[in-house]
Curated annotation (Swiss-Prot):
Protein name (database record): NAD kinase
E.C. number(s) listed in UniProt: 2.7.1.23
Classification lineage: Bacteria, Bacillati, Bacillota, Bacilli, Bacillales
Organism field: Lysinibacillus sphaericus (strain C3-41)
UniProt KW Transferase keyword: yes
Main subcellular location of this protein, as a coarse class: cytoplasm
UniProt-annotated catalytic positions: 45
Superkingdom of this protein's organism: Bacteria
BP GO annotations: NAD metabolic process; NADP biosynthetic process
Subcellular compartments: Cytoplasm
Protein task: Involved in the regulation of the intracellular balance of NAD and NADP, and is a key enzyme in the biosynthesis of NADP. Catalyzes specifically the phosphorylation on 2'-hydroxyl of the adenosine moiety of NAD to yield NADP.
Keywords: ATP-binding, Cytoplasm, Kinase, NAD, NADP, Nucleotide-binding, Transferase
GO cellular component terms, semicolon-separated: cytoplasm
């Protein structure tokens, strides 16, 4: 089996990376950064996001697993003290693969080819200077005109991140859906929106069309992308899925409880 390792690059993560690399090679596995079958992320959820985008062109063959060197994450459930146990499980191929849905973001331009991105957590659209005015279309039909700071569109697995901070719902990651959440929308007697997050199933899509401003600051997970000359931004549940190597039960609602409810 071929493997690669993504480190957060702090001292502890780098030390664990070297240990993991040595142990796995001792078991006969091959270190291959170009075409791995399993990627070990050592750091936090942000580190795994970096690993996901690094290998987003290999999603049909690569599975991810995370070791957290900070707080327990939604993607990283192994502790540094469990490294040897994890290595042994990888060497024995003693794991199942679970798949979660992703978000496809297609940016259409007036005078250039479109750009397409995949997000594991979310994509956001914001104006760099002024109030952002966007027409929101659902399945080809005008739904509302939004005035505010922008929109966040999240995956189910990303619903516990920025989406939750905006008041969005938490969605179990096995559900193929996307969630559209307003960012500081203006609602008064003149300007009105639904004022609530919208959850769309896999066979639905959302289009944001700029009314005036055509230059935006976009994020796709941790990536920051400036977009100009924008005609429309189309959001779908992607055909691709992310694959995680699961070695033991990792109940989603338990993670939610530990992250947001339980006392230290």
């Amino acid at each position: 089996m071929k493997f690669a390792i993504q480190s957060r690059r702090d001292a502890q993560s780098n030390e664990l990376m070297e240990l993991a690399k040595t142990y796995l090679q001792d078991f006969g596995l091959t270190y291959d950064e170009e075409a791995p079958e399993i990627v070990v992320s050592i750091g936090g959820d942000g580190t795994l996001l970096h690993a996901f985008h690094r290998y987003s062109h290999l999603l049909d063959q690569v599975a991810f697993v995370g070791i957290h060197t900070g707080h327990l994450g939604f993607y990283a459930d192994w502790k540094p003290s469990e490294l040897e146990k994890l290595v042994l499980s990888i060497a024995k191929k003693d794991f199942n693969v679970v798949e979660y849905p992703l978000l496809e973001v297609k940016v259409e331009h007036h005078n250039a080819a479109s750009n397409t991105y995949l997000a594991l957590n979310e994509a956001t659209v914001k104006s760099p200077d002024v109030t952002l005015v966007m027409d929101v279309e659902l399945n080809g039909n005008q739904f509302e005109r939004n005035r505010g700071d922008g929109h966040s569109v999240s995956t189910p697995s990303g619903s516990t991140a920025y989406n939750k901070a905006l008041g969005g719902a938490i969605i179990h990651p096995t559900l193929a859906a996307l969630q559209i959440t307003e960012i500081a929308s203006i609602n008064n007697r003149v300007f009105r929106t639904v004022g609530s997050p919208l959850i769309l199933p896999a066979h639905h899509h959302c289009v944001l069309r700029p009314v005036n401003e055509q230059n935006f600051n976009m994020t796709v997970d941790h990536l920051q992308i400036t977009q100009g000359d924008v005609k429309a931004i189309v959001f779908n549940v992607a055909n691709e899925r992310v694959r995680f190597a699961r070695f033991r039960p990792f109940p989603f609602w338990e993670r939610v409880h530990e992250s947001f409810v339980a006392n230290e």
